[in-house]
Amino acid sequence: MVRCRVRSPSESPQQGSGQQRENERQDQDQELRPEDVPVYGRTHRGRYHYRHRSHTRRRRSCRRRRRRACRHRRHRRGCRRIRRRRRCRRRL
């Protein structure tokens, strides 16, 4: 993190032309600010990022997928019970 440097009163010139003061202001504006510095590494990409994967998944049975769903989530929500169970429709 870059911290802004604060000049002491004795360090800053009391007298001088207006042009020098303008140059000093521009120099202060060009200093790096924490929000301007690019962040490398992990950044917040959104909460649904884990679902989109480049590799193709192998097909699994519905039971296995359903069990894993609530464990996989970060905030462990209870499994939602489905009143009507559907059977897998496998194409031959």
Swiss-Prot record:
Residues 42-76 have a biased composition (Basic residues). Residues 1-76 are annotated as: Disordered. InterPro entries: PRM2. The keyword Nucleus applies. The keyword DNA-binding applies. GO terms for cellular component: nucleosome; nucleus. Testis. It comes from the Eukaryota. It is found in: Nucleus; Chromosome. This is Protamine-2. The lineage of its organism: Eukaryota, Metazoa, Chordata, Craniata, Vertebrata. The gene is PRM2.
